[in-house]
């Protein structure tokens, strides 16, 4: 927001922006409109009505196809885990929502066991600390965190992975000094001392979620960072699962080549940037723009990696 404020203070001819938070910047966009500065969104947009154009991948279509491909990889049944790069951007929300909708409509035997939002570590720390410490769960068996976020539920309405371990009292009424264990066998309570949320690392958070569900067969990751986080998790836990994700940096390509990633949504970053500049220039000149410019995507697999058309899109 501060960067946008600085740029608007220079009164540019137009602004092109990838909106990281759908609820942010509306005041700035209003100020831009008052100053006759057109705003074009690219990669990730918002519902703001004053945008001159939205230039991006069709995230919903790509996510639905990702669900189909992951379903095929896991045999159309079983548990999967989602790694979502954030909980606020339009691109992340669209990729998650459309993926869920496709599974619900066509693959009822696939259960989303856990979802890890990469921008909500503190929430996850609170939830997991509560589970580790054996705190009481909410109505319906859900364990809420500080913001009331509940665990993923299976299709039977029960929380995926069960509840935290409750400490028992000795016969004399005094609490026993005992250790609780998480799904992976890690000691989480010792001598009656509670685990503090902020002492749990991100790796421990993810591993805890993963260890609760040892039968996870697939992972859906919504951008390059999420794919890498999924790969790191599988490596730490010496586990295997099908991975379907977005983007294609060098680490992802290496994982694709050696079979650790099944397939990737390859976007068109050059085309997206080019189209955003053209749309911004047209808006500055009061020329018409398409409301939505779809820059397309292709599926990248180990077999298609060396195709000439694929190589043109890699960055």
Predicted regions and their residues:
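A residue-level marker of the well-folded mature domains of exported/periplasmic proteins
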Residues: 1-315
């Amino acid at each position: 927001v501060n960067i946008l404020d600085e740029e608007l203070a220079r009164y540019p001819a137009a602004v092109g922006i990838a909106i990281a938070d759908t609820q942010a910047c509306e005041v700035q966009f209003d100020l831009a409109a008052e100053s006759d500065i057109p705003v074009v969104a690219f990669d990730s947009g918002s519902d703001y009505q004053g945008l001159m154009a939205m230039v991006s991948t069709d995230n919903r279509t790509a996510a639905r196809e990702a669900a189909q491909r992951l379903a095929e990889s896991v045999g159309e049944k079983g548990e999967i885990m989602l790694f979502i790069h954030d909980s606020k951007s339009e691109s992340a929300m669209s990729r998650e929502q459309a993926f869920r909708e496709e599974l619900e409509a066509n693959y009822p035997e696939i259960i989303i066991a856990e979802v890890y939002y990469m921008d909500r570590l503190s929430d996850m720390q609170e939830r997991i600390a509560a589970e580790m410490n054996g705190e009481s769960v909410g109505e319906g068996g859900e364990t809420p965190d500080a913001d009331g976020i509940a665990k993923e539920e299976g299709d039977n309405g029960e929380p995926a992975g069960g509840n935290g371990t409750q400490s028992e009292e000795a016969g004399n009424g005094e609490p026993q000094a005992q250790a609780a264990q998480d799904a992976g066998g890690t000691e989480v309570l010792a001598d009656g001392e509670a685990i503090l949320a902020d002492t749990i690392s991100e790796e421990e958070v993810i591993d805890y979620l993963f260890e609760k569900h040892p039968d996870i067969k697939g992972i859906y990751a919504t951008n390059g960072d999420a794919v890498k986080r999924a790969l790191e998790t599988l490596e730490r836990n010496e586990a295997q699962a099908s991975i379907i994700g977005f983007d294609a940096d060098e680490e992802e390509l290496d994982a694709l080549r050696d079979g650790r990633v099944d397939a990737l949504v390859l976007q068109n970053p050059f085309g997206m940037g080019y189209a955003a500049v053209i749309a911004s220039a047209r808006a500055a000149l009061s020329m018409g723009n398409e409301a939505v410019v779809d820059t397309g995507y292709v599926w990248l697999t180990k077999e298609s990696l060396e195709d000439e058309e694929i190589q043109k899109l890699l960055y």
